[in-house]
Amino acid sequence: MALTFYLLVALVVLSYKSFSSLGCDLPQTHSLGNRRALILLAQMRRISPFSCLKDRHDFEFPQEEFDDKQFQKAQAISVLHEMIQQTFNLFSTKDSSAALDETLLDEFYIELDQQLNDLESCVMQEVGVIESPLMYEDSILAVRKYFQRITLYLTEKKYSSCAWEVVRAEIMRSFSLSINLQKRLKSKE
């Protein structure tokens, strides 16, 4: 029993050290990925946004989660991870495949998946053994509610072309705001 405990402790320490040696440079790595994702989102546009003005909607982006001056790096990484995960979930539905260019969607999935992998290693490095991502549950919950509103909107609009155009533009806006958050994190370092 004692041997199992010490083995478990040793594995945790070794895992933590291996994550720490990854040298997480989130702002540089993630910002580049966000820019590529923004380019792909822009290329997905199928109709003019002006033809969808009547469908505009305020999804109540959780701006305060991206504006807080006291934002800790671990909290920012957790929020960014949740945003990327929810974006991945939103765009990986059969309804998005029907409305958007599948080749661009595939590239977008690959980009989001890479960002999620980068963020997961950063979360482990920044949060470590001391803190828990659950400490930032309010911030993560705000992001989840934001994406629930987007999903509800798409459902209410029956996944129309205009609804997808409005959502595409909204996700572009949220990615732009996350790039600004990363710039602030970089300036704090």
UniProtKB/Swiss-Prot annotation:
Which key words tag this protein in UniProt?
Answer: Antiviral defense, Cytokine, Disulfide bond, Secreted, Signal
Signal peptide positions on this chain: 1-23
Q: Where in the cell is it found?
A: Secreted
UniProt cross-references to Pfam families, sorted A to Z = Interferon (PF00143)
Entry's PROSITE patterns? INTERFERON_A_B_D
Q: Does the keyword Secreted apply?
A: yes
Disulfide connectivity for this sequence is: 24-122, 52-162
One example GO MF annotation: cytokine activity
Main location as per UniProt: secreted
TM ranges are none
GO CC aspect terms = extracellular region; extracellular space
| Name of the protein described by the UniProt record | Interferon alpha-8
Identify the species of origin. Answer: Homo sapiens
